[in-house]
Amino acid sequence: MEKFEGYSEKHKSRQQYFVYPLLFQEYIYAFAHDYGLNDSEPVEIVSYNNKKFSSLLVKRLIIRMYQQNFGINSVNHPNQDRLLDYKIGFYSEFYSQILSEGFAIVVEIPFSLRELPCPKQKEIPKFQNLRSIHSIFPFLEDKFLHLDYLSHIEIPYPIHLEILVQLLQYRIQDVPSLHLLRFFLNYYSNWNSFITSMKSFFLFKKENKRLFRFLYNSYVSEYEFFLLFLRKQSSCLPLASSGTFLERIHFSRKMEHFGIMYPGFFRKTLWFFMDPLMHYARYQGKAIFASKGTLFFNKKWKWYLIHLWQYFFSFWTQPRRIHLNQLANSCFDFMGYLSSVPKSPLLVRNQMLENSFLIDTRMQKLDTIVPVTALIGYLSKAQFCTGSGHPISKPIWTDLSDWDILDRFGRICRNLFHYHSGSSKKQTLYRLKYILRLSCARTLARKHKSTVRTFMQRLGSAFLEEFFTEEELVFSLMFTKTTLFSFRGSHSERIWYFDIIRINDLVKPLN
């Protein structure tokens, strides 16, 4: 406990950041507006009669949120209240969105100040490739072959947004900002029901995505801080990523309360993390925890994590949200891939002088497969094919120019191949490529009121070049006299690209 208190004091900041006055600075909302325009996932900014932004209107909005009858009016007469606000000019979707983005920017300031890199860590930028999503798969290929069990975890969600606000109190001691956050969240009466679904938690409303992402990340860093402390105290292996987790103020008090409720429980569970062969990875609202040991060992850890969420964070969770399976006999969904570690037979011939021996061995290998059925279902929902995978035209794009249509289909195909380049079976990707290519041809043929065969003959090789992937382009430069399609089986090896920093849009609905 003394070590923990020292660790907590080391990472705890005693400075109090008063961020509330920044909400009335106009440049903050200019940053929020620029973020919406320059973000990699664009946010649609709702226009407001082409009027210029004014911090005075934001101030009026904040004052109105503090009125006592604000919550009652918005619940009893939501449509009438919204229409009245729109007419008088100081409440609209535009200013609600700007206030949400502005508050998210302001409240992130204390955390960015705590995470400023020290001069000794100037070497870190050379490891920028580790930011890539694909960088984790070579790690899994190296480590998972020696593990026994895998737990697939669905991270529990708070039953009420007030819990997220209370978690922020340990880091932000600016009371007016927290009160404003409560009033702002209470306005959206549908947010409480909106947050009760883990799937919907990540399909944020576009105009409030940054604020929700901040609230969720602050919650996740809380329980990961607990796991980080146990890991650092029980293993001699240093963690290079320890700086990414944020501290929790007054954590030792909660630890003492936890020890009173479960005397001796904390001391007994320390050995859970003594084994260095334990690996944790989180993505979106899920996490995987792989370890080496017995079934009893992993079941105890499962119940330990459930008690941690229920009694430590007041988050209700159920045992079925943690699926424990033997790694060699299970398949898990991770980052858009269906991964498994099967044992493949390998026949090795060993010859010694005049005698020859055949040795039958079984080797383990991380197998990553593209969930083709789910991707075809998504393409069907996007009207590129039928539910059975039969390509169809996309009428909504027939108003575009021919090259715009080719560019859109080609970009989707290249992005799909780029993200799923690590697949063990590339045949499924070529099936998706066939669907997109024929759907593009039918869309162009429908636009020009001709047949697919006639249109393909008119475009010739220019049509096929739009669907070339990076691997095929490399092979076309190496072997210019050979057609690209003859190399389909020769470049079946998995390729991980280190320039992918976010999940493909086609993968998001699958998680």
From Swiss-Prot:
Keywords: Chloroplast, mRNA processing, Plastid, RNA-binding, tRNA processing. One of its GO terms (cellular component) is chloroplast. Signal peptide: none annotated. One of its GO terms (molecular function) is RNA binding. InterPro entries: Domain_X, Maturase_MatK, Maturase_MatK_N. GO terms for biological process: mRNA processing; RNA splicing; tRNA processing. The keyword Chloroplast applies. It is found in: Plastid, Chloroplast. Its main location: plastid. Usually encoded in the trnK tRNA gene intron. Probably assists in splicing its own and other chloroplast group II introns. HAMAP family: MatK. Belongs to the intron maturase 2 family. MatK subfamily. This is Maturase K. It comes from Phleum pratense (Common timothy). The gene is matK.
